[in-house]
Amino acid sequence: MSTSWPPRTVIRKASGLRTLELTLDRVGLGPVAGVDEAGRGACAGPLVIAACVLGSNQRKSLAALNDSKKLTEKMRETLFPLICRYAEAYHVVSVPADEVDRIGVHVANIEGMRRAVAGLGVKPGYVLTDGFRVPGLPVPSLPVIGGDASAACIAAASVLAKVSRDRVMVNMDSDHPGYGFAVHKGYSTAVHTEALRRLGPSAQHRQSFVNVRNAAMGSSLMRPLAPRESDTGG
């Protein structure tokens, strides 16, 4: 029995990295945009979302493309300019930590994906997202489980989002020294936790995260009390 397109349920696996896009293109639903994020689980720094439409004839140029989480940092940095060069369109959106705090990580992720798709230079006919549905898109969309390892356009978006965010965190390390942002990129490592305990949260930390709130409470308890007027001799 043949599979109908577009599919109406979550896709869990594709036979090749370009299978979904090429099939959607063949039935007139292209161009296909992939969307992914970086920094969802971090307790500091922005949430970065990218949308990308790949050209159908760029398979050889982007042969090394894969799930960005499986690529080394050097490989991602090598792929980044190639994706920017060969993509039909791409757009990267950054949602700052204070906005993530205000509306929540999940809502920020959904809103960021909408903004990323809206910012594309070409209008997609279909959108593939990594793992969950994105309501409110102006075109049909479908979540793909493990999308950054199953669809080339999502894998490209994953690289764009991760490299863009990593660069932000390296720059942030200069503005907020002592936290090690350039190393752990804002995720809750042992080194980051110790820096939070010692320094307290910075303006780039997500105050809605439990470990950041705990660090803020701890640093305020350790802060010396201001002297009373009677103790100053005034």
Swiss-Prot record:
Q: Which CDD domains match?
A: RNase_HII_bacteria_HII_like (cd07182)
Under which EC number(s) is this enzyme classified? Answer: 3.1.26.4
Q: What does the record list as GO biological process?
A: DNA replication, removal of RNA primer; mismatch repair
Q: What class of enzyme is it?
A: hydrolase
Superkingdom field? Bacteria
Residues where a divalent metal cation binds: 36-37, 130
Task: Explain how, and how many, cofactor molecules are bound.
Answer: Manganese or magnesium. Binds 1 divalent metal ion per monomer in the absence of substrate. May bind a second metal ion after substrate binding.
Instruction: State its location(s).
Output: Cytoplasm
Pfam hit, one: RNase_HII
Give the UniProt entry's GO cellular component terms: cytoplasm; ribonuclease H2 complex
Outline the extent of the RNase H type-2 domain: 30-221
User: InterPro entries attached here?
Assistant: RNase_HII (IPR022898), RNase_HII/HIII (IPR001352), RNase_HII/HIII_dom (IPR024567), RNaseH-like_sf (IPR012337), RNaseH_sf (IPR036397)
**Listed cofactors:** Mn(2+); Mg(2+)
Supply the alphabetized keyword list: Cytoplasm, Endonuclease, Hydrolase, Manganese, Metal-binding, Nuclease
Q: Which reaction does it catalyse?
A: Endonucleolytic cleavage to 5'-phosphomonoester
Give the Gene Ontology MF terms in alphabetical order: manganese ion binding; RNA binding; RNA-DNA hybrid ribonuclease activity
The record's PANTHER family line, in alphabetical order, gives: RIBONUCLEASE H2 SUBUNIT A (PTHR10954), RIBONUCLEASE HII (PTHR10954:SF18)
Function (record text): Endonuclease that specifically degrades the RNA of RNA-DNA hybrids.
**UniProt family annotation:** Belongs to the RNase HII family.
According to UniProt, the name of this protein is Ribonuclease HII
Native organism: Mycobacteroides abscessus (strain ATCC 19977 / DSM 44196 / CCUG 20993 / CIP 104536 / JCM 13569 / NCTC 13031 / TMC 1543 / L948) (Mycobacterium abscessus)
